[in-house]
Amino acid sequence: MSSPAATSPAATSPAPDPAAGNRAPAPPRVGMFPPIGLLERGPETAGAFLAQVAGAGIDHICCGDHVSFLVGVGFDGLIQATALSMLHPALPIYSGVYLLPLRHPVLVARQLADIARLAPGRLIFGVGVGGEDRHEVSVCGVDPATRGLRMDECLAIVRQLLTGTPVTCHGTFFELDEALILPAPAAPIPIVIGGRSDAAIRRAGRLGDGWLGVWNSPRRFAAAVELAAQEAAAVGRPGPPSRHAMQVWCGLADSKEAARACLAPAMQAYYQLPFERFERYCPYGTADDVAEFLAPYANAGCAEFNLIPQSPDPDQAVAGAAAVKKLLARA
């Protein structure tokens, strides 16, 4: 390919099912993030937690990604995904989200192909440009103002490399001559594109299998689904992306007061901002309270929820997430 823009997403992502529009929508899938530091507690503890998650009927385990966030903390998302994949034989892993513009696309394609060999069909690759910490971007040698353009170029390169075909690229950011990654994954890796802006939603329409939202209303979510579909049609994709998702911090406990007491300090510590800045987008209370908050998003087209549950203990977080899934299936 002469430039990343030459890659057609229709050629590198699964074709939509023409009969899907005639079926009732499936209940939303529900995944969760593990407690912070789980992998550092050793394989026995981490493996037991993943077995508990899978046994509760939760659909996937999630992992984030940061290089040097706010005060310098981070944990590489694809290293986490690899470790998690080795600790359970079947549980899917959802990266939510990997900061793709901070990396070289050929190296990322190699990592993805290797994970596909170790855990076939189990990775959902959520990507984003990063928004909360511009300093994290700049210390990686990337101009924060170029993140969107770099994402477009990276996605086009990664998608084509994962098909096992050579890539020649004379782009704005990358020069490649017959780059090749083998063996290619036996099945396409779903790529879900995160971000709050219209630009991110359009990117999902052009290059993604779905959009991953955060901090938005059900009305905004429905508008995003429509905008992604319009963008997909504009670039000639055979159908709209449909793997739309929401990332949701939530508090799960026996009462609203107890749930908020878990959620608020956790979010303030992570983002270094007052909880009130996020509160209207973050449900807390019992599983019924959280499911009631999420149901309008499912009605707006959300197929997956990635919960970041905060509870008095990990067992209650798992049980609460599983209960939310069951309640949404009945909604």
Locations of regions flagged by a protein language model:
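Active-site-adjacent structural elements that line small-molecule/cofactor binding pockets in enzymes
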Residues: 1-331
